[in-house]
């Protein structure tokens, strides 16, 4: 099964500006832009610095990260998100094997946009407080995306 994750924000926030900030976060983490495609959604593919070849190690899933930035269109993944006035700003596809990379990205993103929510297709929602708790664990938990965030409350 392939899971996807979405960063949700209030729909009144300027999407183009946030997309620019998101790219800066990825660059800070060592990703470089490789391809930008499509009109309504921007398909951003990033390759980890140091991976200067176009060939990928199929065992290193974190070396390629595929993120759709919704700058022109509106996607609301659930009724719960709609009732909270949230819509998709960024969608991570095929998140399996990239859980810790996504956690690091979310931690940096939510430092700037603390009202953002991370939604996973398995029905789980993560707030900034949830992400902070998981990010600050003594031992990284690569399975965090598949666990209820309440698991990490003390």
Region spans (language model):
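Short, extreme N-terminal segment that most often corresponds to the first beta-strand
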Residues: 1-44
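Generic alpha-helix signal with a bias toward terminal, lower-confidence helices
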Residues: 19-20, 38, 59, 68, ...
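Aromatic-enriched hydrophobic runs in primary sequence
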Residues: 1, 15, 42-47, 54-57, ...
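Ampiphathic alpha-helical segments that act as solvent-exposed interaction surfaces
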Residues: 11-22, 88-117
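Alpha-helical structural elements
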Residues: 17, 63-65, 85-87, 114, ...
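Short, intrinsically disordered low-complexity segments
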Residues: 28-97
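Acidic, proline/glycine-rich low-complexity IDRs
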Residues: 1-4, 8, 100-154
């Amino acid at each position: 099964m392939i899971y996807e994750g979405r960063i949700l924000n209030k729909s009144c926030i300027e999407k183009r500006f946030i997309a620019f900030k998101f790219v800066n976060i990825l660059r800070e983490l060592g990703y470089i832009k490789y391809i930008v495609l499509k009109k309504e959604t921007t398909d951003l593919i990033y390759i980890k610095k140091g991976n200067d070849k176009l060939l990928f190690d199929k065992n290193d899933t974190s070396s390629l990260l595929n993120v759709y930035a919704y700058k022109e269109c509106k996607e609301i993944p659930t009724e719960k998100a709609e009732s909270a006035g949230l819509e998709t700003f960024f969608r991570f596809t095929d998140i399996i094997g990239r859980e810790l990379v996504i956690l690091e990205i979310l931690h940096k993103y939510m430092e700037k946009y603390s009202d953002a929510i991370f939604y996973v297709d398995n029905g789980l929602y993560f707030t900034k407080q949830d992400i902070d708790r998981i990010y600050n664990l003594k031992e990284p938990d690569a399975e965090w995306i598949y666990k209820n965030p309440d698991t990490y409350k003390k």
